[in-house]
């Protein structure tokens, strides 16, 4: 303690005759173990800012000829102080590396926190995808069957993949929140279905006025009001979006758009739905238009641009490739670069499966409910058959029951059903060892 507080070396010739320091603990240790602790040399270790970061302590200098314990000489103290200086440099370098890694990961967390705050619906995605990616990658390293049985990762490889997973959607920091969180087809900053509802109320009022004025009969009024309510219910349902919109439903939206007229604040007669509203309400699947889908897809371009602009150290040089490939397909029809399976690393293909499975099972999206295990695996299996995801990784995902491990941590009990693997598209039993 004295060496640390005084920043001075302490050279004790013999602990048993030394009066300036309390060596009762040392003597008790010697008595218990039979060891003889006599000469001590304690040297403080200082970093580049002259701060004490540790001590180097040597015990029992020995005479090279007789082997007897003797005090540490001045030359030995000088040598020890030189070694302590070198040790301090090495320790400082290690601490600096640890601090830089901690700072770097804090910046990653900062970016993800900003994305989470923008979009609470997809907030957990940035954390769940890297977790599932690592689960799958670790399962691949453990598998002893199939084409991937020789795949291995070191701890550095795992760290690199984890960092890539955490950064895989960093480009979303610029994506407009009303596009990311678009829960219904007519939603922009707010859901425009309320405007459509208001127009229906205007149409109903006009019909009631027409009946009062004798332009239509009471029976005609009742029939037309029923049609208005039917059309309103249809548009409300259509606005939600879904897996697929039928041709007849698209035609009905277009028919409704011109079936009713309403007068705007300027006194102009307008079609019931604007061209933009028709375009949005006739989105075939989901809630995004082609233009909005392009805005969403742009996040991966930006992710790659951001990551490739960074001066990565040698052990992290693959981060842009791993993070930037999770929207590619095995048949080369993905985006942004149209890479094929052979042009992608196993790690990037792992992240592709993780990104899809997380999205299928996520229960915090505004536009859909989280799917069950059976539903999610069935969709993923069809993607295997359609050359969307890597077939070998899908097999490992199923064989090693990675989906079960993930489900226990991140899925609701009602989503975790009993999976009959024989009914999952693309499933093949594992080969014999």
Q: Residue spans of the language-model regions?
A:
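Regulatory sensory and allosteric helical modules in signal-transduction proteins
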Residues: 1-36, 264, 282-283, 289-290, ...
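Signal-transducing coupling segments at domain and membrane junctions
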Residues: 13-39, 61-71, 329-340
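A short, aliphatic-rich beta-strand micro-motif
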Residues: 38-47, 54
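Output-coupling edge of small sensory domains
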Residues: 43, 48, 59-61, 342
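Amphipathic alpha-helical "output/dimerization" segments
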Residues: 51, 67-92, 159, 346, ...
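Short alpha-helical interdomain "coupling" segment at the junction between an upstream regulatory sensor module
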Residues: 89-108
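Histidine- and acidic-residue-rich, metal-dependent catalytic cores
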Residues: 106-433
């Amino acid at each position: 303690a004295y060496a640390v507080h005084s920043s001075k070396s302490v050279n004790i010739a013999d602990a048993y005759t030394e009066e300036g320091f309390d060596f009762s603990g040392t003597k008790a240790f010697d008595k218990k173990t039979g060891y003889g602790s006599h000469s001590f040399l304690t040297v403080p270790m200082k970093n580049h800012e002259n701060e004490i970061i540790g001590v180097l302590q040597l015990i029992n200098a020995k005479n090279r000829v007789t082997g007897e314990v003797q005090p540490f000489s001045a030359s030995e103290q000088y040598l020890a102080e030189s070694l302590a200086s070198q040790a301090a440099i090495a320790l400082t370098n290690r601490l600096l590396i640890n601090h830089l890694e901690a700072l770097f990961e804090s910046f990653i967390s900062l970016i993800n926190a900003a994305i989470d705050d923008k979009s609470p619906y997809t907030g957990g995605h940035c954390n769940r995808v890297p977790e599932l990616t690592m689960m799958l990658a670790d399962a691949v390293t453990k598998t002893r069957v199939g084409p991937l049985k020789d795949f291995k990762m070191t701890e550095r490889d795992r760290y690199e993949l984890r960092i890539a997973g955490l950064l895989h959607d960093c480009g979303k920091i610029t994506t407009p929140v009303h596009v990311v969180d678009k829960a219904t087809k007519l939603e922009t900053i707010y859901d425009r279905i309320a405007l459509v509802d208001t127009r229906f109320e205007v149409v109903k009022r006009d019909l009631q006025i027409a009946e009062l004025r004798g332009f239509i009969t009471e029976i005609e009024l009742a029939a037309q009001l029923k049609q208005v309510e039917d059309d309103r219910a249809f548009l409300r349902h259509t606005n939600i979006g879904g897996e697929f919109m039928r041709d007849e439903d698209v035609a009905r939206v277009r028919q409704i758009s011109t079936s009713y007229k309403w007068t705007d604040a300027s006194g102009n007669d307008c079609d019931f739905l604007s061209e933009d509203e028709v375009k949005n309400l006739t989105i075939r699947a989901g809630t995004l238009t082609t233009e909005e889908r392009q805005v969403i897809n742009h996040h991966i371009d930006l992710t790659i641009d951001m990551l490739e602009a960074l001066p990565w150290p040698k052990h992290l040089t693959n981060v842009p490739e791993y993070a930037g490939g999770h929207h590619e397909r095995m048949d080369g029809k993905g985006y942004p670069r149209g890479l094929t399976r052979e042009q992608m690393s196993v790690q990037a293909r792992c992240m592709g499966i993780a990104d899809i499975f997380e999205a299928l099972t996520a229960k915090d999206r505004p536009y859909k409910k989280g799917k069950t295990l059976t539903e999610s695996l069935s969709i993923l299996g069809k993607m295997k058959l359609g050359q969307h995801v890597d077939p070998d990784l899908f097999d490992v995902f199923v064989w090693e029951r990675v989906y079960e491990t993930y489900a226990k941590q991140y899925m609701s009990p009602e989503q975790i059903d009993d999976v009959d693997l024989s009914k999952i598209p693309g499933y093949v039993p594992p080969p014999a060892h």
